[in-house]
Regions:
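Intrinsically disordered, low-complexity regions enriched in small/polar residues
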Residues: 58, 127-130, 149, 153
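C-terminal alpha-helical interaction appendages
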Residues: 2-103
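Single conserved hydrophobic/aromatic residue that forms the stacking wall/gate
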Residues: 151-162
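A charged, amphipathic interaction segment
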Residues: 84-146
């Protein structure tokens, strides 16, 4: 049985928060998706989220996370009004699905990003957004396995170095 960083009771809210974060960052602040996500990764916001800090998975909005990531990145950008969109964008789905995958697997957001970029996840939207989330998990797990096989091939083992 997998032990998750936080209770499944928080999962739905956490998915909405990460979805709103990606949506707001891309569609209001107009960050390119990969650029903002990389800022998220190097801030401690990603660590707080993936370890299940209740402030991040239940207590803040996606808009608040975006503003915190911007602040922690050292960018001096005027704060924009909080916007939550009724129509859910591909960026929203990307964050929503990614939050589920991270929670389900326990892998860090950074490790996931090494295996699959945000652009790749966004490209999955037309086909996967209507499917059960388990199909998304299967596909990202396949990409994870491909990534692992590549790094194991490209890095010599200790025995090979002797």
């Amino acid at each position: 049985m997998m032990i998750h960083a936080y209770s499944e009771d928080y999962l739905n809210n956490a998915q909405k928060i990460l979805g709103d974060m990606m949506d707001y960052a891309v569609n209001t602040y107009e960050f390119p998706p990969n650029q903002f996500y990389e800022m998220f990764l190097v801030s401690d916001v990603s660590m707080q989220f993936q370890t299940g800090n209740p402030t991040y998975v239940a207590g803040k909005t996606g808009c608040e996370l975006v503003k915190e990531v911007i602040r922690k990145s050292g960018l001096l950008i005027p704060e924009l009004e909080d916007e939550m969109y009724l129509d859910k964008s591909p960026e929203y789905w990307c964050g929503w699905a990614l939050a589920y995958y991270q929670w389900y697997t326990g892998r860090s957001f950074m490790k996931i990003y090494h295996a699959v970029s945000i652009e790749e996840i966004l490209n999955m939207y037309p086909v996967y957004h209507e499917m059960d989330i388990s199909r998304f998990v299967e596909t990202i797990n396949e990409k994870w396995d491909q990534y692992l096989s590549l790094i194991h091939i490209s890095e010599p083992t200790r025995l090979q170095l002797i």
